[in-house]
Each structure stands twice: as structure tokens, then as C-alpha cells.
Amino acid sequence: MSSGGLLLLLGLLTLWAELTPVSSRKRHQFCNVPPEPGRCNANVRAFYYNPRLRKCIEFSYGGCGGNANNFKSRGECKRTCAE
């Protein structure tokens, strides 16, 4: 294969990698479930990942129960689900 062909192939692979949405990359499955406030009434500030909007959103967590799409900080949510 010529060097021009290799450059074209490399460029196409790079473009594909950049355009591939996060949802099709390896992401924890729990990042796709809706937020669950839990059964208690503590009203704790928490964050969940919204796959449709591709961002972490604040919600009120009851303090017990719920699911794994529940993070103490927006940064932790982003590191786990959005990167």
C-alpha cells in the first residue's frame, strides 16, 4: 500500500474514532438507567448521568436505596460515565 493510501486510512480511522458516540464505547451499563431517588427522605444533593443529553445532572437522593447511577459529585459522574 502506498504512503498516500496509508495516510488516508489513518485519517479515516481517526475520524471514525472521534465521531463514535460515547454510548457505543465502553461505558458502565448503570450509566444508562434513570435516576432513582431511593426510599428515604434525606434530600441529599447527587448527580446522575443522562445518556440522551450526554451529561451529568443534579437530582435529590433520599439517602438510601436507589441505583448505581448516583454520584456524590459531577466530576465523579463525568469520570465514570461521560469519558
Swiss-Prot record:
Cell compartment(s), UniProt: Secreted
Signal peptide: 1-24
Domain of life where this protein originates: Eukaryota
Predominant localisation class: secreted
A GO term from the CC aspect: extracellular space
Keywords tagged on the record: Disulfide bond, Metalloenzyme inhibitor, Metalloprotease inhibitor, Protease inhibitor, Secreted, Signal
SMART domains the UniProt entry points to: KU
The family this protein is said to belong to: Belongs to the venom Kunitz-type family.
Role, per record: Binds and inhibits MMP-2 and shows an activity in inhibiting migration and invasion of neuroblastoma. Intact C-terminus is crucial to the activities of this protein.
Protein known as: Kunitz-type serine protease inhibitor PILP-3
